[in-house]
Amino acid sequence: MPRLLIAASGTGGHLFPALAVAESLPASWSVCWLGVPDRLETQLVPERYELTTVRAGGLQGRGLRKLVQLLQLLAATGRVRKLLRKQGIQTVFTTGGYIAAPAILAARWCGIPVVLHESNAIPGRVTRLLGRFCQVVAVGLSVAAKRIPGSKAVVTGTPVRSAFLSPQPLPHWVPCGDGPLLVVIGGSQGAVGLNRMVRGALPSLLEAGCRVVHLTGNNDPDVGELDHPNLVEQPFSHEMPGLLQHADLAISRAGAGSLSELAVCGTPTILVPFPQAADQHQEANAACAAALGAAVIVHQHAAEHRALGHALEQLMGARLRGNAAASNPLIPMKQGMMKLAVREADQLLVTLLKPLIGAGL
């Protein structure tokens, strides 16, 4: 029986693509999962796959802190090596992040092949440092391939959960009416700056008949500040495929996972890159979508609500005013998103894994 270790941890951007690949594997394969304690995977993974957790962190600190992190990495690598041998793992698949480092190093130690998936336009630290130890580095965006040394990079796109790839109903709790639907994705941790920016731009849209679903995340202190019958605020939704498939427009950060979900749904989007993202990778992700005409970029700054309000007026104003003769700028944006989408990304990654699974014997 082929035995695969999936190392994916932390955020949905790392976890959901890995789960999509796991769902697409042949039924005969056995999957073990490597994660970090107290992260999202402890909620999503155990009901489907055997989960092992190890402490892992980055190497961004200095002095004593960096030394502690290095010792932690060495300890984690030793634990993963024991896991690989105990479970008879033949291949490792990882989506990057902190957990990828001990997984790649332990696999290298044991002579086990690794497929690393990098979803962002600018490769992360682990990809840059440890990609050389992997048999294949799969990338979600073609521009990232140019930043991968050697000839290991293969463009596969970033996998999305299967529900995004088939028609889904509009959730029943979405505000009723004929107005266009705007979906705001604030982020799982609550992007407070983005949420405040959105609330500053919404009142005129709501009064004009626009329906708005605002997914605020868990840590937004201003929930309930704006009250309107056309507005629904929720921390998150398990019905994202239905929301995005039926949305006329979305507002989102520019994480690679979110961008892939928006792309397969063909959802025109205003992207607001997270200003503190490592290496400004969200700026680069957003630029890829904007270059195809799929998205408009609005930056978070002192006059953010005015910039966002202007973009919303440009994209939705004519429809809200009932001007049927005006051209709809959302149509070419939808076409651009469809060009960005790679609907078979999960299958492409499985195809890369199949010839390697025997190489780890």
UniProtKB/Swiss-Prot annotation:
**One of this protein's Pfam families, by short name?**
Glyco_tran_28_C
Look up the record and report any one GO term of the cellular component aspect.
Answer: plasma membrane
E.C. designation(s): 2.4.1.227
**Pathway stated in the Swiss-Prot or TrEMBL entry:** Cell wall biogenesis; peptidoglycan biosynthesis
Q: Where in the cell is it found?
A: Cell inner membrane
Q: Identify the CDD domains for this entry.
A: GT28_MurG
Q: What does this protein do?
A: Cell wall formation. Catalyzes the transfer of a GlcNAc subunit on undecaprenyl-pyrophosphoryl-MurNAc-pentapeptide (lipid intermediate I) to form undecaprenyl-pyrophosphoryl-MurNAc-(pentapeptide)GlcNAc (lipid intermediate II).
Q: What is this protein called?
A: UDP-N-acetylglucosamine--N-acetylmuramyl-(pentapeptide) pyrophosphoryl-undecaprenol N-acetylglucosamine transferase
| Phylogenetic classification of the source organism | Bacteria, Bacillati, Cyanobacteriota, Cyanophyceae, Synechococcales
Record gene name: murG
